[in-house]
Amino acid sequence: ELARQAHVRNVLVSAGYVNEKPLRALCQWLDAANVDLKAFDDGFYRSVCGATLKPVLEALRIMREEGLWLEITNLVIPGLNDDLAMVRRMATWIRQELGAATPLHISRFHPQYRMRNLPPTPNEALLRCRREAQDAGLEYVYVGNVPGEDAETTLCPRDGYPLIRRFGFTVQENNLKEGRCPLCAQTIPGVWI
């Protein structure tokens, strides 16, 4: 509430595992959310996360219904959730349930904590996943955790003009003009500062 009064934007980063009532109450104070959709497979959620997929999908639907700007991150782990058919199912669900303009961040896995035995995600695998999600109809698909990759750039879906160039977590160039492409005036969805 204090942030709202001070005109400060509130963003939630979450695994999406939250009950409906507290989520709806929280949404009134949020402007945006980024949810980690770990995989589009209940078996993965059960074996790797000790959870289930359905509550995460329901949380995503609720956030969209509540009017939040929503972005999704999928950490691609070699051999566990990098199956292209699963990526296509996930992207299709996102397009159908949340909208084609919902950004999807395909992120590189780095061996850490309990998964030190697995290799980092190859760049080629990330780019294949990105193409699969784009082919399923998502307009804004990015590759993350690979600074310098061209797939970090936001392109106008109408004319392909580079709107926002990033390097890792740094915005290097922002060509948006009042939330629109400067060439064709296409409105670019998002929460702009």
Language-model region placement:
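Conserved AdoMet/S-adenosylmethionine-binding subsite of the radical SAM
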Residues: E1-T121, C129
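Auxiliary Fe-S-binding modules of radical SAM enzymes
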Residues: G79-I193
